[in-house]
């Protein structure tokens, strides 16, 4: 597997309103624990669309892994131009910080937001151009990742597309593991 998409809940869907909230530490550690074995097995690219929450934290994790000398690259494929246009200043800064980590950046539709079909185009393009996906998504708590999940699940059923969901139980396991380490 050479490329994997990482997506999941937006931070506010998890009740997290600051990029550096305590909960983010656990989310990022969980992602790191899932990405490192894949990188060690040959993963070269992590693909995100630059949305708030799980995706930007994943971008930060890739940056941290690069600093630890892992050979991994980050691509940000935004669904449309000026995705962060309506975000508050703190979130715009967060997105621009993650953008500096990216090895590749492009817009799937080279125009501003027009309608929700641009999100469907994003999902389809990313799934069609990756070998798999890791979602921080719990089937018991629907949210915005459901649309990507449904499409990725179809890809998995039709091919050898890799699909891994990190649910709230997996996150809780990391919280407990990290707290026992103290």
UniProtKB/Swiss-Prot annotation:
Q: Which Gene3D superfamilies match?
A: 3.40.50.450
Q: Which SUPFAM superfamilies match?
A: MCP/YpsA-like
Enumerate the Pfam families for this protein. Answer: YpsA
Instruction: Name the domain of life this protein comes from.
Output: Bacteria
Return the similarity comment: Belongs to the UPF0398 family.
- Protein name, please? UPF0398 protein lwe1908
Which organism is the protein's source?
A: Listeria welshimeri serovar 6b (strain ATCC 35897 / DSM 20650 / CCUG 15529 / CIP 8149 / NCTC 11857 / SLCC 5334 / V8)
